[in-house]
Amino acid sequence: MLINKRKRRKAYIYNDGYEYINKKIKNKFIFICLIAVGGFSCVYKIKKKEKKEKKGKKKKEKYYYDQKQNCKDKFYALKKIKFHANPKNLKEQILLNLREIKYLNLLKKYTNIVYPHEYWIEIYKPFYKQKKIKSDKKKKNKKKIKKQKLSLFKDTIKIIKKRKKDKLKKKKKIEFFFKNIQYSSDTDDIKITFEDAHPEKVKNNNNIKDIKYIKKKVQKDYKKNNKKNDKNNVNKNNTYNNKYKVVINKIIGKKYIINKIKINRNKKIYIYRHMYGHIYGHMYGHMYDLFNINKNSYYTYNNNNNNNNNDKFKSLKGLKRNNLFINKNQTIPYPSSCYYYSSHTTNKFKSLNEKQFTYVSSFSSHMWCTASRRKTFSYNQKDNYQEIKKLNKYYNYKSSNFLDKQILNKQSMFYQNKINNKKNDHNVVLKTLQTFYDDTYIYNLENVDTQETKQYSNYNNIENVKNVKNVKNVENVKNVENVENIEDMKKKKKNKFVIYNNIYTMQNIKYTSYKSNVFFIDHDVNICNSYSLPNIFTCKTKNKHNAFFFPRHTKFNNRPSKNKKYRLSQRKYYINNYKNKGIKFKLKKIIRKMFQMKNKLRCVTGTYINNYKIGKTIVKNNKKNIKNNNNNKKNNNNNTNKKKYYFYNQHSPCIDIFKKTKRRKKKKKKKKKKKKITFINLLFNNQIKYQTKNCKNKINNIQSRECAHKILSCHHVFILLYYIYKNKTSISELLYEQYINNIKKNFLINKLINLYIPIYNYSEYSFNISFIYYILSNKKRKQFKPTNILSPQVYSYFYYSNVLFGSRYVHQKKKIHRNIHKSKLSNMYAHLSNLDLFLCYRNKHIYKYIKKRQALFNFFFYKRSYITHYEKYFTNKHFIKTQKSQLKHFTRRPTLKMSENNYSSKNYILKKCYMFKIKKKIVKNVNIRRNKNMCMYLSYVIHIIKSHNLCNKINKEFNKQLTNNVCKKKVARQIILDIFYNKTHPRHHIIKYTYNFYKKNICLSGCKKRIFLKIYCFHKGGYVFSRLYGREIKKKKKIERIRNIQVQKQMDYKSRPFINNKRSSKISKQIIYFSLNIILKNYIDYILRKRYFLCSYDHNLIERKWLMYYFTKVVSKYFLNPRKDNNNNNIMFNNNNIMFNNNNIMFHNNNIMFHNNNIMFHNNNIMFHNNNSMFNNNNIMFHNNNIMFHNNNIMFNNNNIMFHNNFIVNNYMDKYKNMFIKSCNDKSIPYQMLANLQNEYYLSKGNNNKMNITTTYLYMKIRKILNKYSKRNEEKKNILKGKYCYNNGNFALLSYINKKHKHNKRYHQIKEKNGNNKETKYKFNLYIRMEYCKSTLENYINTRENMNINRNYEIIQMIILGLYSIHNNNIMHRDLKPSNIFISDNNIVKIGDFGLASYDYTYPKNRKRKKRKRKSSNLSYEYNIRKTNILNLQKNNTPFNIDKYNNNIIRKKKEILFKNCCTKNNIPTKEINSNSSFQYFTKKKKKKKNVHDHHTLGIGTKIYAAPEQLIGNKYTKAVDMFSLGLIIVDLFTITKTNMERMKILCNARHRILPDLLIKNHPQVAKLCQNLLSLDYHLRWTSEELYKKKKNIYIY
């Protein structure tokens, strides 16, 4: 489309959910906004300008039927126009509609379009500006006017410019537009028509007379008001009359005009929609003349229609224009209506029977009007189309309920249930939950674009209360049983009635409208409204009903009011009589307490949540009311004032609850106490609302109307008041058993998820709910009080078995909560406490749903305005002001204190958890790191992990390795996911988590998979853990004392066994639970927002069995079995799955997990699987042992390196040395370590009670044991002579040579066997387990069919990264070729085969360290251990093959190489191994070498080796760069045979590259020529290539 050509110079500003367009684009997009099908709302700013009147003059009353006073009000269009449309969204939304309908052909006829501000200018033009009209221009313009079919946007721009310059063009183009306005699409089946008036009316004489009458009035008024300006204004009357004709023709004819409605009160934002009579909206008198209706006939009513009550349409046939359609107080013009043809259904449905029409009723331009409504109904061609047109002409939404035949037939489910079920059934909740989604036509629409409907709000309307003499409503007659009583009421008294229409419409989908009953009540009525966007924000002027519709914040403050009347309204709520039968309802204690707190049930707008407003009326005892109302006689007594209860919302399930309640006794009323009910607000899910004035006033300031709209329009939460009565029925049964059978699951859910419709239940796939949880307080359980419940936004199935903490949460006596219904919602309530919520996702549909819900979470959960305000309140109120009160209550319970300096920092530091023992006072300071923002914000959850000192080290190292090395972030995620989905370890080890208390801080490990469980367990037992591990406790008595304190009175601590529940610790408990709830909720949101957490069907973390089984074991064993202790003071839970060591074993934050004494270290791709030990650091450097892990390439340069099956490397602290010595079996071995090592190595137990020792530790032990004894020299000689020998295939250890081992039988057996041997041999068998890579680069080159250039670039960059790390450590590979480059399963390239690698001694830094390294490299020399040769050398000079592609033979000869690489020239070598890679060994004494003699000659593969490596004595690390150049040539050439490949490589050694490579890849050819240069000083180094990274190929 043409939108793509636009230059976007300025960024779009996002403000309060509205997106504004740049000023330069406004002319383009207003055209689309006006013409877009489906009611797209465009905003156009029009400013009203009024003259200031003098102070002395009285203000004149404005009557809108005359034009005199209206001359003062001048409307003009501002230049600065803002729209709510983003061109990005317009592409996706509107233009999709245009493509589907092929509506572009239609739009070509809209080239002459008129905007509202231009109408105003044309009307009022003679009053403020006018110029002389020249006759010459008329002749010229007549020739130019033709039907021009041009592009959309160019025409609109040209027309607007021309109208500003030329006035005559405007007239004729307007006339041309309204003459040729017949619309037609490509198919002739449908014509879009505006039905308010037809061009036939112009022919009527009555209309013409009325127009003349209007002209005379206007001319007289004009002359009176404008006598002064007669000289300047020439031909004023003629121009005005001509324009007045045009305007009237526009009104009578078909037109397209847009009306405005104000959205926000503060900002000047308007919605404009199609409106008839916008120009003459202020003229009351003219409207009667235009439509040929007498003023007196508006309020007459045809009484003959009262008799026909059975037929729905008989009353409609007799209607005339004098019927009741306009109210007395109505100041708006006669509203019109028009048909839209919806954009979605054209291409999908062929027949007219399935096509869809939307009925849009107009609305007032005044601010007090409630809202606009959009009703949709399906239309069948067979039905009387013309009759429906006539009905819709005279339809007025203010006071009539007449809709189409389809709407009348498709009444609401509530209405049908009430008619069918005349008896008082108890299943009212079921009926209320059956919404309009049962319509069969919905299922025809399968795939709906979600982006079209995101920005459209739902319009839910309620008509005004009106005073009418004679009331008749055809639809609602059935709702009332006694028709005779109603007629008597009509005759005797004027009645006020309410019409409640709750109509949900989106742009593309059709729903039926449903209505609630009409209640005839003697007094004023509060009208419930499901508040939508226009309903909230359109109320500006002072209206009598504004207090009912739109309560202000000031009126309903949280403070208790001083007046008695307002107190009643704040505390008591009532329900109306069900069907006006006089049934009395009285509430039980729970329900009444629920409704005492009005602010808890109110939403952010000051309106009540979703539809659950409960009104209140007090009816006085009037005799007239008793006589008039037969239905209310039962309720009223002669002596007392009775109260009426009524619900306006029929959705609420409370009706069922109120029915079943019994009367309370008078004694209970007297003994009532004020009790608090906590309610979860939608905006602050984890918010604790304290009963203080400051809190409530500050929170109310946050609750603005704009934020409320975002919640109410996008997300309606169905609120359950849960209560089970006599074990008969429960809401969960109704929801999950009966109602699901009525809904088609497959069709509905796909639509509902895609459309963001406000849904009250999502069936069994996902149920959107928030709970109110309240427990009656008994005398025996005074300590238990209600707490806030965490309410995540997505639930499906909740599985809570009775095993959770035993069954001790269930009250045995009164049994309020029951565990009868398993795998249902009712089971959830049985265990609701602070954080006893787990999410159990059982269906794949939820993953799709969560993706769609991310926008809603970001929409109203992650706004900073809420967080910052509440943060200030929280810190000021509870941390600073209440420090003194908290310090008093330190006995036997933790309190949380915060300083003034810390509350503004990033983390709250809740200081000083105090604990007192019975005998001795032990005070421990534990710094608990918590979140800054006490609200839901995702980035701070990650900040909790990163803020700790120990975790910072891990994160820094991990990030460095990600940036510097080949490992990418995807690989890191895969490692975490492997642990997460149990690919690396069995299912038992799912729930293993370790608490780290280091330096008095609670440290959370960096692994993301364990955050959820850690925080959960910290809440349940965190304080216990902190108390246990604060100091070293060795004796069992002390441990038992601490446990006795912590688990005091277990029967009383049913909900929180580790915290006392006394009155003095209220604030501390609230702060604790507040902080903990937020962290867990943050992590739940974090799980919901990440894709890879919920991809699988059976998620391990979320599985019910494992969560419940392991967690109950941990908590129940720890709290309920305090006296059970294992050996060595180690508490083991979950079959050695979770280790809690009382001896303060620190599981240090290098992501080490103890799984059955098997530590897992994840190196990038180096896996040591001996007894499940894995290295978890990406690059572990053991330089002291000369074990080099360089980018997953292992260097083994020593001849004596020992590995054992049970080698484990652990990190512990120095203070735990004694414990580890005791835990070892061999207590005689002292503990001592090397000082040079960065990591200290300790001992731990093995499976077979053997010592697990590292290589360096083993050498240290041997040396220290030998040097301990008095006979050191003798034993050294004996060792050298070979008297002591212990041969084993797997293990050799000399630690048995100890004085204490003399009593050991095995010691004497060794002596007897080896006593005769003069020479002993110590055999050390080296076992190296390495990663298996399936393929090599050579296989990749041979097997590929086509050349993948991007893959070649990746391979080269990975090789450069490997060479960079090798060369930084002064190592030369010297045998780099495709067969030595491996490719792993993750397509990561790895360099291997370091058999020929050596140090670059020519490097100047290595010359000084030469002597040191030689000594340190030979550990056998230091430890006095005899040398051995690991490799079996081949002394004979036998020939061998270098490579399978080159069959040249190499022998000892001193011939010069390198005239032609492929000729048979032999390489001078010395002793040669049988493999292709070989090394030089001698048994002779070493001679002193010069610097040039360090590197051997003739090493490497002939083809890939550099020339100086084969000939010269001196070469450097540039040797590897030469072979890299040949590998690049090999990658970028494809050959069919090996001979072609060898020729290309031989020519490349002479810098002769193939022609195709130079043509297709010139940059790669330049790189190869540089790397293949004979002078190694000219070659690029690995550092230079690594620094360039992406710019490697640019030179």
Curated annotation (Swiss-Prot):
EC numbers on record: 2.7.11.1
Entry keywords, A to Z: ATP-binding, Kinase, Membrane, Nucleotide-binding, Phosphoprotein, Protein synthesis inhibitor, Serine/threonine-protein kinase, Signal-anchor, Transferase, Transmembrane, Transmembrane helix
Disruption phenotype: No defect in mosquito vector infection where formation of oocysts and salivary gland sporozoites are normal. Normal phosphorylation of eIF2alpha in response to amino acid starvation.
InterPro entries cross-referenced by the UniProt entry: CC_SR_Kinase, Kinase-like_dom_sf, Prot_kinase_dom, Ser/Thr_kinase_AS
Bilayer topology: Single-pass type III membrane protein
Alphabetized PROSITE patterns for the sequence: PROTEIN_KINASE_DOM (PS50011), PROTEIN_KINASE_ST (PS00108)
Active site: 1375 (proton acceptor)
Parts of the chain on the Lumenal side: 1-28
Compartments it resides in: Membrane
One GO location term (cellular component): nucleus
Topology, Cytoplasmic side: 47-1595
Annotated family: Belongs to the protein kinase superfamily. Ser/Thr protein kinase family. GCN2 subfamily.
Protein name: Eukaryotic translation initiation factor 2-alpha kinase 2
Species annotation: Plasmodium falciparum (isolate 3D7)
